[in-house]
Structures are given as C-alpha cells and as structure tokens.
Amino acid sequence: MAFLKKSLFLILFLGLVPLSFCENDKREGENEEEQDDDQSEEKRALGTLLKGVGSAVATVGKMVADQFGKLLQAGQG
C-alpha cells in the first residue's frame, strides 16, 4: 500500500511540474504579445503624427512661397 501511495505521489508530482512550466511559458508568451501590441500601437501613432506634421510643413511651405513670390513681384513692379 505504501508503494502505491508513493507511486501516486510521484505521478502527481511529475504531472504538476511540467504543468507549471507550461503556465510560465504561457504567461511569458502573453507578455510578449502585449509588448508587441503596444509597440505596434506606438508605431501607428508615430506614423499618424508624422503624416500630420508633414502636411503642416507642406502648408507652411506653400504659404511662405506665396509670400516670397508676392515680394518678388512687388520689388520688380
């Protein structure tokens, strides 16, 4: 009877140890996925920001060019 009890404890222990390793791996995988999601959100936000800055710079450049053209025409006339 004692041999059977020891065998059952050994089987239970050997079953629980790999289970805990699997849970740790799963948690690490979930953490990596969360980090990947955060990084992709940051990249998208940065892309949107750069797009907005680019259009603002283009608008300002166009306004400066128009003003410069007017100054040149006034100086010639």
Curated annotation (Swiss-Prot):
Pfam families recorded: FSAP_sig_propep
Annotated propeptide span(s): 23-44
Subcellular location: Secreted; Target cell membrane
Tissue: Expressed by the skin glands.
Keyword Flavoprotein assigned: no
Gene Ontology CC: one annotated term: other organism cell membrane
Keywords per UniProt: Amidation, Amphibian defense peptide, Antibiotic, Antimicrobial, Cleavage on pair of basic residues, Immunity, Innate immunity, Membrane, Secreted, Signal, Target cell membrane, Target membrane
Modified residues (Glutamine amide): 76
Keyword Methyltransferase applies: no
Similarity section: Belongs to the frog skin active peptide (FSAP) family. Dermatoxin subfamily.
Name this protein carries in UniProt: Dermatoxin-S1
Source organism of this protein record: Phyllomedusa sauvagei (Sauvage's leaf frog)
Gene symbol of the encoding locus: DRT-S
